[in-house]
Amino acid sequence: VNPIDKIISIANEKNILTLVDAAQSISHIPIDVKKLKCDFFVFSGHKIMGPTGVGILYGRSEILNNMEPFLGGGHMINDVNMDSFTYNSIPFKFEAGTPNIAQAIGLSEAINFYNQFNFDQMHNYLDSLYKYLIEILISIPNIKLYSNNINNGPVISFTIENLHAYDVAKLLDTYNICLRAGHHCAQPILNKYNLESINRVSLYYYNTFEEIDLLKKSLLKIIKILS
């Protein structure tokens, strides 16, 4: 987890605009954009148990007021005549056309659901779960972990020697285990380490220690099948 508050502070001293991509941290770290003093803050709805195809873009009002919309359409205008037009107020001037109504409502409900959790309790549980996951993965032959630092949050990537990540993910699916395989939107870093693809396990509050045991059992079977 990057020290984003320190990074923003340095950027602010040099009058550099900052945008925080919180897609991977929004459901694990309590965030106050006003305390961070970031200019923009974004995350995807499905990263916080919401619908796909919707997300949040926060921007400081003084910046948004001075920005020009990149897209025209209904609802983003205040007045139109034959010679000119005026924009609506923020945030509406950036929301041209019919909005993604159902997904926006779903995201709002997901955030309300998330806010019911006791964050400290959730953090402690995920911390224990993550430590157990690392312990289990290390015990499996021919697995290589890509950073097992506890400060990473409950997400870890790995490869299995001589096995393709997509094959591993496909077979895990037959055991009702879902994880990611591929570049994870980070192809340059994979290229740097000469990796074609990797598997990624992401834990959340609804996961259990028993499911991690099932992951180990399934991976051992897959290694035996594909070796």
Language model feature labels by segment:
Residues 1-227:
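Pyridoxal 5′-phosphate
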